[in-house]
UniProtKB/Swiss-Prot annotation:
Coiled coil: 740-767
Residue ranges, compositional bias (Low complexity): 269-283, 610-619, 664-676, 704-721
Biological-process GO terms, alphabetical: astral microtubule organization; cell division; establishment of mitotic spindle localization; mitotic spindle assembly; positive regulation of microtubule depolymerization; spindle elongation
Keywords: Cell cycle, Cell division, Coiled coil, Cytoplasm, Cytoskeleton, Microtubule, Repeat
Listed GO CC annotations: basal cortex; cytoplasmic microtubule; kinetochore; microtubule organizing center; mitotic spindle; spindle microtubule
Name under which the protein is recorded: Protein CLASP-1
InterPro entries documented for this protein: ARM-like, ARM-type_fold, CLASP_N_dom, HEAT, HEAT_type_2, TOG
Residue stretches of biased makeup (Polar residues): 620-630, 637-648, 677-690, 786-812
Family named by the database record: Belongs to the CLASP family.
Record's function text: Microtubule plus-end tracking protein that promotes the stabilization of dynamic microtubules. Operates redundantly with cls-2 and cls-3 in regulating microtubule processes which position the spindle during asymmetric cell division.
Record has RNA-binding as a keyword: no
Provenance organism: Caenorhabditis elegans
Phenotype seen when the gene is deleted: No visible phenotype; due to the redundancy with cls-2 and cls-3. Simultaneous RNAi knockdown with cls-2 produces defective microtubule cortical contacts resulting in abnormal nuclear rotation, defects in maintenance of spindle length and spindle displacement. Simultaneous RNAi knockdown with cls-2 and cls-3 shows nuclear rotation defects and excessive spindle displacement.
Length: 1378
């Protein structure tokens, strides 16, 4: 065994998380390709190591450990299955992990374990039913995971788990009353599933338990009836016998399933989220092939899923709880088949041609009578419904169904045959859901043959099997997926019912990209094959589904969506226009490019222009497609083709097109702008020569002889091309009654006006012209004289819209516009802002460069500043890492020059900045963000900044990530703490802070801080903010915090006390000494620069007036005169040590060495402060290496009698250790509580009791409840020390308010007598604490539960308890009403 590869790797396992990650990747790679040795000691060692990884606190280590266990189970199921069941409790505990990914991976691994060949869901349910685990676990997430597993078993293996499910009915009923809402919802849904699958006997049994009140039971029955009536994906009806009968198979036979029948567990219809590539559980894992293999081996007519996913063969599976909660993964990496001859290829995919060939590839069957047909089809129905039947027999029965239909003669009653076929719906749906690929393929072929033969007569079968087929599309087995995909195409082609469309529309929100892709494919089929009567009521829903497919995250789904859009546009142009209008410009461009490339071959033979006469067309098109800037186009080419003003439609269609204006040109609908190509580069399109009737009679003699052979897109190619001038113009303008009523002169004038407008728009040569939401208004050009007398002359033709500039401004453009492109062309602000939203990266980069020149203009108006600010905010939120530094620099320049006009923009800009600062970024990006933040701080009025930040903080619309919230809080701290010494524009001392927005922000801060998910991240910033707020204005601080809840006030008081912030003002020297001795958080200035803080702070108004009068030298001298250098022993930040484990270990070792030296109290206190600072900053990560040693040192410090050692700091370190690594303190619970009590009782410091109370509260809430209660009872019963008793009573009282009600009921009988005994104490302090504890118990568990323990008290003491309980209830009701 010493030479085994796994044994060698396991010997390298350490406690270092980084080393575990590296080792885990090596083990995962090996265990995915090699089997694990069956040696018992090796397997036990392997699982012990993995269990240690799972129980650790590192998220990535837990994830890699679960991946290793999954890969090992897939490669060596026969070796590891029994060992996994022995350690199933570890997986159950991981179902309650804080990370969603870990929870899902643990659940999927449990499901995979249940579906092994020699395993069963019954065995896993046995583990989940153990008291204290699974359904009875104290962690609500574990309960939810267990319930989801039960729902999976109910939907997939109902016959196996029915007896256990019936036993669990009382437990499920109790869970519907769980304190957690999510547990209640899942348990309710589980009961509904059980009722749906089990029928009326289960409903009666649930009602007979009487554990659910009448109202809830009525709701359950209503939801049960609704589900039965509406759901189309229910499993076959099961006949359930409540009592075990001799006909039932024994449980051992269910646990030991036959290897020859791998399809006994019927999987659910919906797919689930999996962390590996998923496959069917009963068949060997079969990875998909690469794209090259698929293209070379696939048949000529591939099915919609015959090509592999671009993700390299690993198809993600999504969890759809409305159909089936969870799905066990059994996929495997393609590396298993690198050297194997059994590797599957793309030729396994099933195509439409394969289906049609298989229709008649069946053995011949002789049919004698109608009775003979009924007998044979009923036999087939029974065989197909039996999951225990051999798969070959089931496949033969599916072929028999096709053979019966093929060999029927005219004497057979057709109505009888169709009725019997409809009775096969459940059996066929059962076969479609099967795990055996041969069964799924034959079932899909049989169903397709039925739809092809009978059509709408078997619509019930189609509606039944469609959900199962769509669910099978997402599996990784190519035969199953492609068979199901082809079946869906047949269903949509032949069955046109509303139920079919409803089932399809449910896939729009599926998490499986394969299902969404197949939805887009069948949408194209639906649009093309369904008649108008069936499509008209659901046309809007079809359009919405097509739009969702176009905007999908998957590339292949978007391609299929664009094809569906082309078909929709061809048949329903108005609906396509509505979709096109709602799409963003990038999607519109994709539609134009994709459809034009697909329809170019159709238009090439109908184009009158010679391709050779336009040598630059192809080159310019390539520049456009490669996102080159339009300014690179040669202007000489542009001038040479300028008279040719006809443009191609910006969204081509699959129909033949001509080169004139479309018929809808005069319409005000969006299709006119979309199809007429406003602003299109004319040199890139095929053009026709203009005739004199087009309005260019006097422009050039070269164009007087036009080509008269052009055909209209509305006319047939066989019709005559001769048209009169008015007919030609009218055909260009459209065929509406308005155009028909025009005279020849009026029509010519209208056509000339439209041509002139297009000429003006084509001068800018933009790539992204489709982004313009309105026609740019340009100076008028000379128009034909006949147009001046026309009644159709637009009123705004002679007006030009340009921003007015000051003639003395150095930034004034020569032509009313600013900015210049790469070719020297002048650009307007509107043009630059439009270019900033371009999808072209080069275009956007050029626009940002031009914008830097524009924003320095002091004459920008308020509206222009608003538009520029909105554009910069959008650019900052896009997350483009390539341009982010340029964008931040532009924002800094914009603020510097235009900050007086940006009051309304400040709130939005700060929000985008905080969101960006909360995201992971490179060091250079972080530096740029810091510089931009500094520009905000040093430019805007600090009071206005505070209001903007507080308003944004309380705005419920904006949701920030935890790191973004941290950035926001630190920004407020910077406003308070005067962090920028070279520009002291921050809040003055005694600034009025008692405002509504400040109060709301403080309440919001506490809501964030008390959130258990993010409170640890925000705690240091909240402490810093409270101290800074108190230092800025103590009076307003008192007013604000006076209206907050008591726990918030107590917390703030403790923070101020710990940080040395007292109400009385002492001399500066003493204040600094006390601040240094008591402060555990000392902010480090940015970039580690020493900052000199002036005692006499310069106000904002004074600074504005003196900044212009005094030179920099005088100001620096003034600051130096009134400045005091910072204390030299401020603790530096250790955040950089979080990822540098080598330096972190050395630093911690030095501090621990200093802590052991009790003779040097100063160094010991400094070392404790440094370690506590590391824990506050999150840079202490080597817990496994130093936890035991640090805990021993803390215990020694708490036991010493030296008064020079800061024991309060040791208590805070113990709190941090318990919060971060509570499990490591489980075994020393009694020691920890005893040490804290000893420290509090032997100290002369009056404030030590407060610190001890906080520490005891943390220990009681994190350590095992039974041990805490046991030591508390021992201390209260044996110790006569009143101080220790008071601390224990306060600890228990706090614990009563924090723990769950079920846990409290378990310990009431143990702790209530102790409080009653303490109520009889001689000490008034002990009696007071006992009363508060009894009141807390009565509030939580009720007077009826406490009455047996309170009988020994006299009437006066009971009245006192009733009085306090009444006051507590009244205060709670008053707080809730407010």
């Amino acid at each position: 065994m010493d030479t085994n590869w796994l044994y060698v790797l396991l010997q390298k396992s350490t406690a270092d998380p980084l080393e575990r990650l590296k080792l885990g990747n090596v083990i995962l790679n090996e265990v995915s390709q090699r089997k694990v040795s069956p040696h018992p000691k090796l397997v036990n060692d392997f699982l012990d190591v993995m269990s240690g990884w799972l129980t650790g606190s590192n998220f990535k280590v837990s994830t890699i450990g679960l991946e290793i266990l999954d890969a090992a189970l897939r490669t060596s199921p026969d070796v590891l299955a029994s060992y996994y069941f022995d350690r199933c409790s570890v997986l159950i505990e991981r179902m309650g992990d804080a990370k969603v990914q870990v929870r899902e991976m643990a659940i999927n691994l449990c499901l995979q374990l249940a579906y092994l060949e020699n395993s069963s869901p019954v065995m896993l349910l046995d583990r989940l039913c153990v008291p204290g685990t699974g359904f009875q676990h104290k962690q609500w997430l574990v309960k939810v995971g267990s319930l989801n597993i039960l729902r999976e078993f109910l939907s997939s293996s109902f016959a196996l788990v029915i007896q256990q499910a019936i036993t669990l009915i009382p437990q499920l009923c109790r869970l519907t009353n769980d304190p957690n809402s999510e547990v209640r919802d899942v348990s309710t849904q589980c009961l509904i599933d059980l009722m749906v699958y089990g029928g009326k006997p289960i409903v009666a049994k649930i009602a007979a338990t009487r554990l659910i009140n009448e109202q809830k039971m009525a709701t359950l029955l209503q939801r049960y009836q609704t589900t039965v009536a509406t759901r189309g994906d229910l499993p076959p009806k099961h006949t359930i016998t409540m009592e075990t009968t001799p006909a039932q198979p024994s449980r051992n036979s269910l646990l030991r399933r036959s290897l020859r029948s791998p399809a006994k567990i019927i999987h659910p219809s919906a797919s689930t989220t999996s962390f590996t590539s998923s496959a069917r559980l009963s068949t060997p894992p079969r990875p998909t092939t690469t794209a090259a293999q698929s293209l070379s081996l696939a048949p000529q007519t591939p099915s919609p899923l015959s090509l592999p996913s671009p993700s390299g063969g690993q198809m993600s599976r999504s969890r759809d709880l409305t159909r089936s909660s969870l799905r066990a993964p059994a996929g495997i990496s393609i590396s298993r088949y690198r050297s194997s001859s059994c590797a599957p290829a793309a030729q396994c995919a099933i195509t439409l041609d394969d289906f049609k060939k298989s229709f008649t590839a069946v053995p011949k069957t002789t049919i004698y009578s109608n009775h003979d047909i009924r007998e044979k089809l009923e036999l087939a129905n029974l065989v197909l419904r039996n999951a225990n039947e051999d798969w070959s027999k089931r496949a033969n029965q599916l072929k028999l169904i096709r053979s019966i239909i093929i060999n029927c003669d005219e004497n057979i009653d057709r109505s009888l045959l169709i009725s019997i076929i409809n009775e096969l719906a459940d059996a066929l749906e059962f076969s479609i859901r099967d795990l055996r690929s041969q069964i799924v393929r034959e079932a899909a072929v049989t169903c397709s043959f039925l739809f092809e033969t009978f059509g709408m007569e078997v619509k019930n079968v189609a509606e039944c099997v469609l959900p199962a087929a769509l669910a099978q599309v997402a599996v990784s087995t190519k035969v199953i997926a492609s068979s199901a995909a082809t079946l869906t195409v047949f269903i949509v082609q032949k069955i046109q019912t509303r139920q079919i469309f409803t089932t399809l529309s449910e896939l729009s929100s599926s998490k499986a990209k394969e299902q969404r892709r197949q939805l887009a494919v069948v949408l194209e089929t639906l649009i093309a094959s369904w008649d108008l009567k069936s499509k008209q009521p659901i046309l809007k829903q079809i359009a919405q589904l097509v739009q969702n497919a176009i905007c999908d995250a998957d590339g292949e789904t978007r391609v299929a969506g664009r094809k569906a859009f082309a078909k929709l546009e061809q048949l329903h142009g108005t609906t396509a226009d509505l979709i096109f209008r709602e799409l963003d410009p990038a999607k519109q461009k994709m539609l134009r490019d994709g459809v034009s490339s697909s329809s170019s071959s159709l238009n090439s033979d109908r184009d009158n222009n010679n391709q050779k006469q336009q040598p630059n067309q192809q080159n310019i098109s390539q520049k456009f497609l490669s996102q080159r800037s339009a300014s690179a186009v040669d202007k000489s080419i542009q001038l040479s083709v300028k008279p040719q003003t006809t443009a191609i439609p910006s969204r081509p269609t699959a129909m033949p097109m001509n080169n004139r204006l479309p018929k809808s040109s005069t319409s005000t609908s969006f299709s006119a702008v979309r199809s007429s190509g406003y602003g299109q580069n004319q040199s890139t399109t095929p053009n026709r020569a203009k005739t004199p009737s087009d309005g260019f009679a006097g422009s050039s003699p070269h164009y007087t002889n036009g080509n008269n052979n052009n055909k209209s897109s509305s006319s047939s190619p066989s019709t005559s091309t001769h048209q009169t001038p008015i007919q030609r113009v009218a055909s260009n303008l459209g065929s509406s009654s308005f155009v028909a009523s025009l005279t020849q002169e009026q029509a010519n004038c209208l056509q000339n006006a439209m041509n002139t407008a297009k000429d003006e728009m084509s001068k800018n040569n933009e790539d992204d012209e489709f982004l313009l939401d309105e026609i740019r208004k340009t100076p008028p050009k000379e128009v034909p004289r006949s147009y001046n007398n026309s009644p159709f002359k637009p009123s705004n033709l002679d007006s030009s819209v340009h921003r007015s500039y000051n003639n003395n401004s150095p930034f004034r453009p020569s032509s009313g516009s600013v900015g210049s492109g790469s070719n020297g062309s002048v650009q307007s602000i509107e043009h630059i802002l439009k270019a900033c939203t371009s999808s072209s990266l080069n275009e956007k980069r050029d626009a940002i460069v031009n914008l830097n020149q524009v924003i320095t203009d002091p004459n920008l108006c308020q509206l222009e500043c608003k538009n520029i600010g909105d554009t910069l905010s959008r650019l900052l939120a896009e997350g483009n890492n390539t341009l982010i530094i340029s964008i931040l620099d532009t924002i800094s320049i914009f603020i510097k020059f235009q900050y007086k006009k940006l009051d309304n923009w400040l709130k939005l800009a700060l929000g985008k900045l905080f969101a960006k600062m909360g995201a992971d970024a490179l060091p250079n990006v972080k530096s740029a963000l810091s510089s931009t933040q500094k520009m905000f701080l040093t430019t805007f009025d600090p009071t206005f900044q505070l209001k903007a930040v507080c308003d944004f903080m309380c705005d419920p619309v904006h949701l920030l990530s935890p790191k973004s919230r941290l950035a926001l809080l630190e920004y407020i701290c910077l406003l308070f703490e005067e962090i920028w010494p070279e520009d002291p524009r921050c809040l003055e001392r005694q600034t009025h802070l008692d405002t509504p927005y400040t109060r709301a922000a403080i309440r919001k801060m506490f809501a964030w801080m008390f959130d258990p998910r993010i409170g640890a991240i925000l705690m240091p910033a909240c402490e810093r903010l409270v101290c800074a707020l108190f230092a800025l204005n103590a009076a307003d601080f008192t007013m604000i915090f006076g209206e907050l809840p008591s726990e918030c006030r107590d917390w703030a008081y403790r923070i101020l006390q710990l940080n040395g912030q007292q109400n009385n003002q002492k001399p500066i020297e003493k204040e600094k000494e006390r601040f240094i001795s008591n402060n555990n958080y000392k902010p480090c200035p940015l970039d580690n620069e020493e900052i000199e803080k002036p005692i006499m702070k310069t106000t904002y108004s004074t600074y504005e007036s003196t900044r212009k009068e005094y030179s920099q030298t005088e100001r620096i001298a003034t600051e130096n005169q009134y400045s005091t250098p910072p204390p030299p022993d401020y603790r530096t930040s250790t955040a950089h040590l979080a990822k540098n484990h080598v330096d972190q270990a050395a630093y911690i070792r030095n501090q621990l060495d200093a802590i052991r030296d009790f003779e040097k109290a100063d160094k010991l206190n400094e070392a404790m402060a440094n370690l506590h600072g590391m824990m506050c900053e999150g840079s202490f990560t080597l817990w496994n290496q130093f936890f035991d040693e640090l805990l021993d040192s803390i215990y020694q410090i708490l036991s010493t009698f030296s008064q020079s050692i800061r024991k309060k700091l040791a208590l805070r370190i113990l709190q941090k250790m318990c919060t971060a690594q509570a499990t490591k303190l489980f075994d020393s619970t009694e020691i920890a509580i005893s040490k804290v009590l000893q420290c509090a009782c032997t100290s002369d410091d009056n404030t030590m009791g407060v610190a001890a109370e906080d520490c005891l509260r943390i220990l009681a809430s994190h350590l095992p409840l039974t041990r805490v209660v046991l030591i508390s009872r021992r201390i209260l019963s044996q110790d006569d020390d009143d101080q220790r008793g008071v601390l224990i009573l306060k600890m228990l009282t706090r614990m009563f308010q924090d723990i769950d009600i079920e846990e409290l009921h378990l310990i009431v009988n143990d702790v209530a007598p102790c409080f009653v005994t303490a109520y009889e104490s001689m000490s008034s302090t002990v009696r007071k604490c006992a009363v508060f504890g009894l009141v807390a118990l009565v509030q939580r568990v009720g007077m009826q539960r406490m009455e047996p323990h309170l009988r020994t008290l006299n009437a006066s003491k009971l009245n006192l308890i009733d009085l306090y309980v009444g006051r507590a209830k009244s205060s709670e009701s008053g707080a809730s009403s407010n």
